[in-house]
Design a protein with these regions (language model features):
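Compact, glycine-rich, soluble single-domain proteins
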Residues: 5-41, 46, 50-54
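C-terminal structural segments of small proteins and small subunits
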Residues: 49-81
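Intrinsic-disorder/low-complexity, polar/charged segments enriched in Ser/Thr/Lys/Arg/Asp/Glu/Gln
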Residues: 1-5, 58-60
Length: 81
């Protein structure tokens, strides 16, 4: 399992969230986004929209599986400043 904490550059609105979920779904690993005490399945559009990610927040990307390193590297691009 790999975890990486990043600072979000902009608000995660509908289109960016959909693109993020599409990217996360390409990986076999389980992928989650953690904010505070919430952990959301990164492959769920409803989950990603409900968590309300805002620019400037710190989130933790979590991946666990055979392609976890590739998943973290790819998904980090959506958040990094």
């Amino acid at each position: 399992m790999i975890e990486k904490t990043v600072t979000v550059s902009t608000n995660m609105e509908a289109r960016p969230a959909a693109l993020f979920v599409q990217a996360a779904s390409k990986f076999q690993s389980s992928v989650f986004v953690k904010i505070d005490d919430k952990q959301i399945n990164a492959k769920s559009i409803m989950g990603m929209m409900s968590i309300g990610i805002l620019g400037g927040q710190q989130v933790t990307l979590v991946a666990d599986g055979s392609d976890e390193e590739a998943a973290i590297a790819e998904l980090n691009k959506f958040f990094a400043v």
